[in-house]
């Protein structure tokens, strides 16, 4: 099944501790996505002198389930659901379900 959300999309988080935050999709991993500056967690890292990595506490983005984000509609400024429309030539086009407006060019 094709993903309704792709890398580079502007999204709004609709559930969880970061509800309402907006950001850009950095990575899509199956049914999980990483959103820039959202769901920040602390990770403790060991020092690795061979790689030149200092140890300590590092903050980074953790993944969020894909069902907890909606694509931001620039026209309305809200997060909306995305569906697919099949064109006459057989191509699939992502569209907003509320307005039918196309996401992809």
UniProtKB/Swiss-Prot annotation:
Family of this protein: Belongs to the universal ribosomal protein uL24 family.
Role noted for this protein: One of two assembly initiator proteins, it binds directly to the 5'-end of the 23S rRNA, where it nucleates assembly of the 50S subunit. One of the proteins that surrounds the polypeptide exit tunnel on the outside of the subunit.
Pfam families: KOW, ribosomal_L24
Matches recorded under SUPFAM superfamilies: Translation proteins SH3-like domain
PANTHER family: MITOCHONDRIAL RIBOSOMAL PROTEIN L24
Species annotation: Stenotrophomonas maltophilia (strain R551-3)
This protein's name: Large ribosomal subunit protein uL24
Gene Ontology cellular-component terms listed: ribonucleoprotein complex; ribosome
Keyword RNA-binding included in the entry's annotation: yes
């Amino acid at each position: 099944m094709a993903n309704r959300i792709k890398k580079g999309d502007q999204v709004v988080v609709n559930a969880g501790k970061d509800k309402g935050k907006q950001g850009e999709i950095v990575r899509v991993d199956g049914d999980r996505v990483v959103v820039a500056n959202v769901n920040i967690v602390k990770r403790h890292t060991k020092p690795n002198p061979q790689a030149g990595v200092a140890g300590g506490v590092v903050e980074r983005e953790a993944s969020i389930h894909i069902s907890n984000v909606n694509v931001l509609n620039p026209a309305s400024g809200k997060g909306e659901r995305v569906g697919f429309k099949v064109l006459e030539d057989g191509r699939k086009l992502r569209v907003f379900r509320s307005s039918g407006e196309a996401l992809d060019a």
